[in-house]
Amino acid sequence: MPRHSVFALSILALSITATVWIPTVQAETNLLRREFYGPVNPELFAAFLDDHDARGRENQRDFSSGSGTNELVDELSPVSERETLERFGKRNIDEIDRTAFDNFFKRNLDEIDRVGWSGFVKRLTNYLATTGHGTNTGGPVLTRRFG
């Protein structure tokens, strides 16, 4: 028992140390990044965001693609880049992910419908009667009810 409590306390101490130490390490500025890009001026960053927000609102157009969403058109991008992006059709990712799931259950429901629920119940009662799993007092209870 003492070994268990020592182990639990050591795990607790390690987790507390990691919880305190990791965010402080991640919050420090990377020296390589600071040397490469230079110090970040907050005013420059705010001006950058303002410029891009204004530019985005000016170039926002509504396309009748059926989705009803607005898309940003970049007037400065070359035509070749836009053509490569437009080459791929717009697809709903949820639809793509659901198809395999839906097909699996549709197939199984079709198999049940072919046999019918009455056939399923008869096969279940026959199985339970022959294996003896459906007996309370030694006799086939389900066979007497449904058969």
Swiss-Prot record:
It is found in: Secreted. The keyword Secreted applies. Residues 1-27 form the signal peptide. Its main location: secreted. Residues 28-89, 146-147 form a propeptide. It comes from the Eukaryota. Keywords: Cleavage on pair of basic residues, Neuropeptide, Secreted, Signal. Coiled coil: none annotated. One of its GO terms (cellular component) is extracellular region. GO terms for biological process: neuropeptide signaling pathway. The keyword ATP-binding does not apply. Myotropic peptides. Belongs to the orcokinin family. This is Orcokinin peptides. It comes from Apis mellifera.
